[in-house]
Amino acid sequence: MKKWFFRVSAALLAAVVLILAGFSWQAARREVLPAAKAAPASGRFVKAADLEIFVQEAGPADGLPVVFVHGTGAWSEAWRESMSALAATGARAIALDLPPFGFSQRPGSARYGKLDQGRRIVGVLDAFGIRQAVLVGHSFGGGPTMEAALLAPDRVRALVLVDAALSVGTDDARAPEPPLLLRGFLATQPLRDSVVATFLTNPLFTRKLLQGFINDPARATEDWVRLYQRPLVVADTTPAVGAWLPALLAPTAVAASERPASYQGLKVPVFIIWGERDTITPLDQGQRLAKLAPHAELAVMRNVGHIPQIEDPAGFNELLVKAVAKAAIKASSAASSR
């Protein structure tokens, strides 16, 4: 019996190793294009802080700037409908690719912490010569968006946080010690990258991953799946995502965007849009955020999960357009009262 158990275990382990190795090989064959060659002609690269960041634009150059920051696995094109909706109102919409996703340059030293990412967002404002903008951050992009607002508060007219993964704890909190098994996994690059190649950057799993974030699986349409898959041909995407994982799963320090006092001190309007059925960042996180920020408004989208702009684009864009309009009015009122 014991001999049989060990044989079965060895066979299963060998099968797992072969699967991981196979998908790693496929990733290496697929991820061969330079970002500049793979990127769509609808955008361009700008130097932002330490990296060349890919951006896409819509709307008049003299419109109210609205800068979009996407979530995990997405890229600037995921905001296309929202950008068009804002451009139709006269706003200037700018969406960026936050590394390691999309087509932006990846940092050689794996600097993916929220503060580094926040500096890149401010760098995009610098690259465009933008004095003040409305910042829109979704999911994992919410933390860097908030970091940008804390780094340069005078550059932010308003915040729009969409199902934001902020990990707000307490002001005296320290970065938690990750479990030993997780530390070992993250530190073992060949294993880490093999798992990433199998599940995260594997086009065969794109639809399943997307469906795991939304309430209605049918909303993961072929068009959306292809959109998410498009950057997966960029050279070294798998090792870049692998290098990003420690910043997501085992950060070494508590970011300013994770401290309640950072929100209590915000002086700009904060518009919070949250899916009622979000299982990734549950609604109570959005409700807590609305209580922390003094100038916050919470809008809850019914029967929507973690990605409102995919699940109910018309409803989301209506809320977004209203939020940006309110931000413009409040900014004008503040300027006239000086």
Give the location of each predicted region.
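Short beta-strand/loop motif that positions the catalytic acidic residue
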Residues: 266, 272-274
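Conserved alpha/beta-hydrolase catalytic His-Asp/Glu region
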Residues: 24-35, 172-174, 197-264
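Alpha/beta-hydrolase fold catalytic core
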Residues: 1-64, 88-91, 130-131, 324-338
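Active-site loop/oxyanion-hole signature of alpha/beta-hydrolase fold enzymes
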Residues: 48-58, 95-140, 175-177, 318
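Acidic catalytic loop of the alpha/beta-hydrolase fold
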Residues: 277-281
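Catalytic active-site module of serine/aspartate enzymes centered on a nucleophile-bearing elbow/loop
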Residues: 294-338
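Conserved HGGG/HGGXW glycine-rich cap/lid loop of the alpha/beta-hydrolase fold
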Residues: 58-103
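Conserved hydrolase catalytic core segment
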Residues: 131-175
